[in-house]
Amino acid sequence: MRYPFFAMVCFCVLIAPSRAADAPYVTTPQNVIDAMLKISKVAAADYVIDLGSGDGRVVITAAKSLGARGMGVELDANLVRTATRNAQREGVQDRVSFYKDDLFFADLSKATVITMYMSESVNLRLRPSLFKLKPGTRVVSHDFDMAQWTPDEKMTVPVPNKPYGQPKSDIFLWVVPADFSGAWTWRIPIAGINQEHEARFEQKFQVAEGKGRVASRAVPVGNVQIRGDTISFVMGATVDGKTTWRDFRGRISDDTITGSVFTVVEGDAVNKSQEPVVWRATRTARGKMIIDAATEFVDEDKVAALFLTKEQQ
């Protein structure tokens, strides 16, 4: 169902950090908001925080259409008052709230979903704060990415009457990854003998590489995947002349992983040759997840060009 109130949306777009206080509004159609909420899978259990919330329509849409709760962070006190009135008018004042605050200092800890429409340079300044959020928190950005932190998902929606750039909008989704870096140990049976396993992982954003050892022998580790607090990887070993791959899947909580391991023997007719067994690993040494933006470059001329009107282009 469509609501006239949500026909068009104005986002506070931060062209550069120095302009955060006087950023212009750019009109955004409802289909972009719908796509942002869809790609981040917003549901009634979520708490949505919109950074640069303007008149509040992203959070209000999430509350009215999807039953979510949330808040907006906005520097302009007049817009905060407008957003509060709009929430009352739409009957969601008990589910949403709006605050005048600097987005770089706002408390984001309650968020399960962060929405934003800011320049890449501002995104990069925000990135360290986003990595402090609980693993699994979804971050969705309209039109601007986060340089070396590649999105987990991306979609493009048509915007025929967009007042700047191309007649489309890119929407990026990131899932805040758990810190999987460091050394992990565990024991599982191999050929009937409980064997000591060790794996060491280096991680940059949600991408990791590992090296493994089984009973002091080096073994390959590959296909490492991290999404929120869930991880998976495979570890190889040779047993009775056959290559055996173990598929580890689990969930991280601080320095512990709990999950299951499947065993696949090379040449088996079936994909999983054994029933999964419980797997529990302990981190014995912490690493350092790399999230440094110091070497990343943002082309502000390119950013500014995106906001040229059709008449200016």
Provide a role label for each language-model segment.
Residues G56-I60:
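Glycine-rich SAM-binding Motif I of class I
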Residues A178-V277, D299-K310:
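Central antiparallel beta-sheet cores of small beta-barrel/beta-sandwich binding domains
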Residues A44-G54:
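Conserved class I S-adenosyl-L-methionine
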Residues R69-E74:
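Conserved SAM-binding motif I beta-strand of class I
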Residues T27-A45:
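Conserved alpha-helix/loop element of class I SAM-dependent methyltransferases that forms part
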